[in-house]
Amino acid sequence: MVGRIPDRDIAAIRERVCIEEVVGDYVQLRRAGADSLKGLCPFHNEKSPSFHVRPNHGHFHCFGCSEGGDVYAFIQKIEHVSFVEAVEMLADRIGHTINYFGTATSVQRDRGSRSRLIAANAAAAAFYAAALESDEAAPARQYLMERNFDANAARHFGCGFAPSGWDSLTKYLISKGFEFTELEAAGLSRQGRRGPMDRFHRRLLWPILTLAGEVIGFGARRLFDDDPMEAKYVNTPETLLYKKSSVMFGIDLAKRDIVKGHQAVVVEGYTDVMAMHLAGVTTAVASCGTAFGDEHLAMLRRLIMDDNWYRGELIFVFDGDAAGQAAALKAFDGDQQVAGKSFVAVAADGMDPCDLRLSSGDQALRDLVACRKPMFEFAIRSLIPDGMVLDDDPQAKVDALRRSVPLVARIRDYALRDEYARRLAGWTGWSDEGQVLARVREEANRRSVPERTRRRSVSVEQSPFMQPPGAPADQLAARPDPRDPTLWPQREALKSVLQYPVLAGPVFDTLTVESFTHPGYGAVRAAIDAAGGASAGITGAQWIDVVRQQTTSALIAGLINELGVESIQVDDEKLPRYIDGVLARLQEVWMGRQIAEVKSKLQRMSPIDQGDEYHELFGDLVAMEAYRRSLLEQASGDDMTA
């Protein structure tokens, strides 16, 4: 059994780690108000940012998919690890030594499973890099030199060599304290007929790293004709760490420049990435052992995008027109917001970036990227023959138009579709631009009728904001609409006390559960009370955690996290006055209900038969109305807008 991590270490690590820096390794964040950052959610596909991080409170929350929690929850979710492994990862990040206690072997006490696999891969990368300097690795060095990659380039990209020995790496790593089961789980070793053996032999290797810079696998290139494994390239198999659908070579090196320049360049191979980076195109990445897919796209979009408007560029560099055309045509069926800002670059002679750099130098690669074509244009023009052919053959002109109109009609953005229709007239040499535009619109309308019908039939079921069919009534009731103006003071009051308990403190604690008319908000108020109230002296991420622990309802716990992260739209210097005003407004609403009850009771009483009681209650009413007026004055000066 793994030694237990003391609570004091868990709290200390959470306190020292900056959640915005951790999340920033995976998501590009931009300021969105006081102590609020936002970006595209890494846990579901979205076009507009609904993922928020509150640095001072140490929490995140997505208003699109409801994922949320502290920095440990984020690492658990994004890296698919246990809580213990998340703590260990963050401890490594800040150099914190965990003082485990309880029974455990020395290896178990040292690390959890994921961390052990990361450590094994890192040790393997160092072993392979050292082996690249050996005499046996001369063919690997020659392969790199022939492509104009010197020793410095090899070190920069972590290139290595797998020796010919049956179990050279395996024996080395076992001597360093790793177990064979760990090496097998990491994809570094496997069980052979003669016992444990290395996975890679006599191959040039590239380490594949995560956004956070952790080695999780390798790509290996065949060098020798007598290599029994005929595949030119092989990769680490699917492991706990290595998922080929979501890893990219070079992403660790390109990440910062992708974020800074709002641009990513996607190439097809390891040497292409190396060539691009060395030529100054430092945003180049490549998929590993599989085609570029949705998860790769989602990762790059999170780095490129920074607000509700998609400002980035995704540039695909292909070896030839056929590959580029196939990829471009797929864009019409995918996310066209991305496709509309995607580009294709193909060298005139069909050379890949590595060969182009060899033949024409670094400037040729920079020019290749600079001369990119919009993906929609590339796809459409791939269906149109050379202009001279069209001039000489009227039938070819008609055929080109017939092929191209349906493709242009698939563009869903009306303005963009019309613009490409006009361009299509020019590309095909069609003199009547209006006729082409009308044809495209007619085709688009024909296609849109079944599409609109389909969308109507699934819109309710697929809405991310709807409860699943058959959801319990109490769950539906406990899910308040954040846009409901009648509930706005209650929501703002709860946000204030969860995010700034010191400011909300004593006044909030005077509010009863009955002040919160929505069951969900009332349940949150009850949880705050059970946690000791706003004046308990607990602040930051710990305060929200303590409140969340007071409920057994996952829905209410999620609501607590949501309220603890949702931005309060006011400048820091105005926060105290704003919170006072919010609480005053909520008190005023509650006081209004109390006054209505007193008035109703007075109407049922006789001032003659119940004189003393009547006059006493009337005096209370006068005092209550005076207090309500003071609350109204306080609330009216809070600079709030509902």
UniProtKB/Swiss-Prot annotation:
GO molecular function: DNA binding; DNA-directed RNA polymerase activity; zinc ion binding
Annotated GO CC locations: cytoplasm; DNA-directed RNA polymerase complex; primosome complex
SMART domains according to UniProt: DnaG_DnaB_bind (SM00766), TOPRIM (SM00493), ZnF_CHCC (SM00400)
CDD domains reported in the protein's UniProt record: TOPRIM_DnaG_primases
Chain intervals annotated as zinc finger (CHC2-type): 41-65
Subunit structure: Monomer. Interacts with DnaB.
Domain notes: Contains an N-terminal zinc-binding domain, a central core domain that contains the primase activity, and a C-terminal DnaB-binding domain.
Protein name, UniProt field: DNA primase
Species this chain originates from: Mycobacterium leprae (strain TN)
